[in-house]
Amino acid sequence: MPHTGQAGVNQLGGVFVNGRPLPDCVRRRIVDLALCGVRPCDISRQLLVSHGCVSKILTRFYETGSIRPGSIGGSKTKQVATPTVVKKIIRLKEENSGMFAWEIREQLQQQRVCDPSSVPSISSINRILRNSGLWTDEMTSSQQNAAAAAAAAAAAAHQAGSGPSNGYGGQAPPPPVTVAPPTPAATPSIARYAKPPALMMNSAGEMPIKPAPKMPPSMGHGHSHGLNPNVSGLDLSYSALHKHWLWNPSLLYYTQAHIQAQAAASGGQFLPYAGGYLPHAMAAAAASSTSALGGFTKSESSIDLSTPGAAGDALSDCDSGKSSPAALSLTASGGGNGAGSAPEASPGSTLSHSRKRNPYSIEELLKKPEKRLRLDSNRLECLESSSCESSQDSPVAPPLETPEDEDPAEAEEEQEEEDSVEVVN
């Protein structure tokens, strides 16, 4: 009879089949040699069988008198769930459906149905109940103990007459849900550290910034939510600021050239490094002068330092957001706009042309031979004619003729400056 399994060779050179017992002929030979007084070590060398196998076979023969191999597959299972025990377990569960497995196990021991050594385990009782259809929960013993304690507490509270009969079938009712006001500890970090709604600006830029309505401090909580627009801890809205601080970015970009122009216009002393920022009084005076003069003049020319103003030089209007602090003109007259502005200028206003040139301006950079702007004659004629027509309408017109003593590059620069004034205005 061929044996199926993994064949191998032991240390003595004998062939064996792993997991299968020795043939009966080999077993009989081992027992016969042992009865003749041969030592087990000599038997193993003679029959090419390992010493452990010889010892095991001889030990079983001396104990039982049999040479048959033992059972394969481990120890024999203990049969504790007899039909009598199974019927008793099912009867106890039918009598009391709320009884747990550990209670059934105690009842089996108290009623002398099972001995302490043969009583089935809790898992065996649960398996019996599950197979019989009386147990559907997959609870462990610890969960059953916790549920039993909760059920006992609920029954004690019910018997004490704490309240009317509830509809939970003898089980503990769920704890009452109390809605507490939100606290900073319970609030998510995103909502807790979110900015107030007054400071949230539209990232897409579809709507302009509008002043938020002021809210009384009593309506604010200790924290602000991003979802509630009516809650704000502090009044940080744009309505608390002045209009000129909101819509005049030139007040924020107050450069050294503006301070120098202000000092020259008011006759005060100019300190180049003394004032690192604009004082509030000077900014307010500049804002009031801009509202009194009725507007600003935008051009790409340099700063005019010759014309003094009554309340200070005017700042350029930056509502459109297209002009930068480097391209601002502070040309202001006593009661009107700049000379290149339009026919609304008063006839008595005079404007001189002493300008402080910026070495980094476009005009100065265009003076270099490699970067000089080349204009064709047709475009130059068109610009000259348009500037002449507009300057004839104005009472005060800057001269467009180039004197003989001026350099052609300076004449071209003057022409470009006047053209830029006309185009911007």
UniProtKB/Swiss-Prot annotation:
It comes from the Eukaryota. Residues 323-332, 340-349 have a biased composition (Low complexity). Keywords: Developmental protein, Differentiation, DNA-binding, Neurogenesis, Nucleus, Paired box, Transcription, Transcription regulation. Residues 402-425 have a biased composition (Acidic residues). Residues 5-132 bind DNA. The keyword Endoplasmic reticulum does not apply. Residues 159-188, 297-358, 383-425 are annotated as: Disordered. GO terms for molecular function: DNA-binding transcription factor activity, RNA polymerase II-specific; RNA polymerase II cis-regulatory region sequence-specific DNA binding. Transcriptional regulator that specifies poly-innervated organs (chemosensory bristle). Also controls the number of neurons. This is Paired box pox-neuro protein. It comes from Drosophila melanogaster.
